[in-house]
């Protein structure tokens, strides 16, 4: 094999000398210089790169996000309306009773996102425990350990720095067993419905006329002589 390669190389050198009159070294140097010159010249006279392909007309452009709307104090039931199921409404989520607009992160908290279960809810307990269980999708953080509370604090700092606060979750006061759950308005209504008791009337003394007094005096005077006769 080596002998065949050496024989081929000798034949090539003889052909170069016979046809070009140059030595093999000079011939290959000239070929390399010609290739380099071609590369430089083609780079100078080459046209500009082609423009990028035009954007398809049927591809919709991303609409700008609407500005956050302040909701004030809302109930948990009202907060569920902003879970991303209605694309016309903002995407909201609450931590420790504070509601934030997370519309800009719809890919995470919107339908189909990894944290879609947290949208429209106060997910404080779930975030602290990094749980996706339904019973943890609540704002009740009682019984959490120090590490879980620290994790929840980190989430709150992240939301405060990235999202706009738009409201708070209305707190519900539980009714104790056996205690009446009447509101002040109900008490006032019941008091107004009771009939008013008429005050007891005092009997006024009957007025005695002068004729009645005179008749009594005459009767006493007539009875006086009879009593004197009985005594004698």
Curated annotation (Swiss-Prot):
Keywords: Cell membrane, Lipid-binding, Membrane, Signal-anchor, Steroid-binding, Transmembrane, Transmembrane helix
UniProt-annotated location(s): Cell membrane
Matches recorded under SUPFAM superfamilies: Cytochrome b5-like heme/steroid binding domain (SSF55856)
Low complexity biased stretches: 179-193
Pfam short name (any one): Cyt-b5
Highest taxon above the source species: Eukaryota
Keyword Membrane among record annotations: yes
Keyword Ubl conjugation: no
Assembly behavior: Interacts with SERL2.
PANTHER family: MEMBRANE STEROID-BINDING PROTEIN 2, MEMBRANE-ASSOCIATED PROGESTERONE RECEPTOR COMPONENT-RELATED
Protein's recorded name: Membrane steroid-binding protein 1
Record organism: Oryza sativa subsp. japonica (Rice)
Taxonomic lineage from the root: Eukaryota, Viridiplantae, Streptophyta, Embryophyta, Tracheophyta
Protein encoded by which gene: MSBP1
């Amino acid at each position: 094999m080596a002998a065949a390669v050496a024989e081929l190389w000798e034949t090539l050198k003889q052909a170069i000398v016979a046809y070009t009159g140059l030595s093999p070294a000079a011939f290959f140097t000239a070929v390399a210089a010609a290739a380099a010159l071609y590369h430089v010249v083609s780079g100078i006279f080459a046209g500009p790169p082609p423009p990028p392909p035009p954007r398809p007309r049927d591809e919709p452009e991303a609409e700008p996000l609407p500005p956050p709307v302040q909701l004030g104090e809302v109930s948990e039931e009202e907060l569920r309306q902003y879970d991303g199921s209605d694309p016309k409404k903002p995407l909201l989520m609450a931590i420790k009773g504070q509601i934030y607009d997370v519309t800009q992160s719809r890919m995470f908290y919107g339908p189909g996102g990894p944290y879609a279960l947290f949208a429209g809810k106060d997910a404080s307990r779930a975030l602290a425990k990094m749980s996706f269980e339904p019973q943890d999708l609540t704002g009740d953080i009682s019984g959490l350990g120090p590490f879980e509370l620290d994790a929840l604090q980190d989430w709150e700092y992240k939301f405060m720095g990235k999202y706009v606060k738009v409201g708070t979750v209305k707190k519900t006061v539980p009714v104790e067993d056996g205690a009446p759950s009447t509101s002040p308005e109900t008490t006032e209504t019941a008091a107004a419905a009771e009939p008013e008791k008429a005050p007891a009337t005092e009997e006024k003394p009957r007025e005695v006329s002068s004729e009645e007094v005179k008749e009594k005096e005459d009767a006493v005077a007539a009875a006086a002589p009879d009593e004197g006769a009985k005594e004698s």
